[in-house]
């Protein structure tokens, strides 16, 4: 996983080069096939596409949960989108969002200094654990490492800076009921753990709730209820999007959608992955020529636990993303549109109700 050593080895390899049937992909009652396009609180179900993704997910040897929406049209598709799942490293999006809000409030600065001390390093994905200590880094450097190479040591530095309780308070502020950060990675818990922590590990979420977090980042919606956008919001969101569009792990959602790698500019995809042995996840903002999309896909109980490039769950995520994006944006991607706000009005389509 990006969260454990074998995933890290996979990441280094990449760096060197730069349900068991339909019943397991169960549908919510709002997603009954054959009923024609239907409206729910989140948008309008794209019924033909819904049937295609159901068929794709039905052959996967594991479980798939998914929520995707095209923001300018309100079209949606989903599979079991409200079932709580293991986040693995996708929970790092919530840490990033809390950092953005604290920078906005003047309680943190991108250029503030954090110190990596002896004993801070943890195993798993990332490279900071191999650096000599003490080492001084900026907050921006730490969060960049947390996002683009899913650095676990950097993640813990971020958690130390903001606190587990602050991240969870922010999650509650967003109105999310089934998303939670439990603890630092590879370190003992410093507070009593909820009863469900052993089941979920580092964090839990749903495909729909993590779509909400990524959509807030893409739309640059940092203001709370009754608050107005501030002049500095765009710069904060641009910094976060730069991290996310330079994502190093690109074998899942980006796999069939573009040929750019993380060393090249202009990617139309900003994403965060998360992996454990039997878990593979990816959540992305995708700047399509026909309009921006958020695609949130989680897989668990996967039979294929390998760390090879053709891992079945990673291939499944890639195929689902390809089907969604090529249906909603047949002309392809537009990297120039991956900017704060995504070219949308502040209250347009699905985001206004979240």
Which role does the model predict for each range below?
Residues 48-81, 293-297:
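A short, well-structured edge-of-sheet supersecondary motif
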Residues 71-72, 110-127, 162-163, 184-189, ...:
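Acidic helix-start/capping segments at beta-turn-to-alpha-helix junctions
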Residues 32-56, 161-163, 213-257, 261-268, ...:
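Structured C-terminal helix/loop/strand segments within mature extracytoplasmic catalytic/sensor domains
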Residues 63, 135, 156-222, 227, ...:
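Mid-domain, small-residue-enriched loop/turn segments at the edges of structured enzyme/sensor domains
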Residues 119-156, 164, 203:
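Conserved catalytic neighborhood of penicillin-recognizing serine enzymes
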Residues 74, 86-114, 295:
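Active-site SXXK
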Residues 2-13:
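Bacterial N-terminal signal peptides that target proteins for export
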Residues 11-24:
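Bacterial N-terminal signal peptides
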């Amino acid at each position: 996983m990006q969260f454990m050593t074998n995933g890290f080895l996979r990441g280094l390899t990449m760096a060197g080069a730069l349900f068991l049937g339909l019943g397991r992909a169960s549908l919510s009652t709002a997603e009954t096939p054959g009923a024609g396009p239907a409206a729910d609180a989140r948008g309008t179900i794209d019924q033909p596409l819904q049937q295609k993704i159901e068929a794709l997910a039905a052959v996967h040897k594991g479980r798939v949960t998914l929520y995707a929406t095209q923001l300018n049209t309100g079209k949606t598709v989903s599979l079991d989108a409200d079932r709580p799942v293991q986040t693995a490293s996708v929970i790092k999006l919530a840490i990033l969002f809390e950092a953005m809000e604290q920078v906005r409030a003047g309680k943190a600065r991108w250029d503030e200094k954090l110190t990596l001390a002896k004993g801070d390093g943890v195993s798993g994905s990332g490279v900071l654990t191999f650096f000599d200590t003490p080492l001084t880094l900026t907050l921006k450097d730490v969060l960049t490492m947390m996002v683009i190479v899913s650095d676990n040591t950097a993640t813990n530095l971020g958690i130390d800076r903001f606190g587990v309780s602050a991240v969870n308070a922010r999650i509650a502020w967003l109105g999310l009921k089934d998303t939670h950060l439990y603890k630092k990675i590879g370190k003992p818990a410093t507070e009593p753990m909820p009863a469900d922590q052993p089941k979920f590990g580092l964090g839990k979420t749903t495909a729909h709730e993590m779509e909400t977090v990524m959509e807030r980042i893409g739309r640059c919606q940092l203001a709370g209820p009754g608050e107005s956008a501030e002049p500095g919001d765009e710069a904060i969101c641009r910094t976060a999007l730069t991290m996310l569009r330079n994502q190093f792990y690109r074998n899942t959602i980006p796999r069939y959608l573009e040929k750019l790698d993380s060393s090249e500019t202009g990617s139309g995809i900003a994403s965060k992955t998360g992996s454990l042995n039997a878990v593979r996840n990816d959540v992305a903002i995708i700047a399509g020529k026909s309009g921006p999309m958020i695609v949130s896909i989680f897989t668990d109980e996967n039979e294929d636990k390998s760390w090879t490039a053709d891992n079945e769950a990673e291939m499944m995520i890639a195929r689902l993303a390809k089907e969604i994006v090529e249906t909603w944006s047949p002309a392809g991607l537009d990297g120039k549109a991956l900017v704060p706000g995504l070219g949308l009005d502040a209250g347009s389509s699905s985001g206004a109700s979240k």
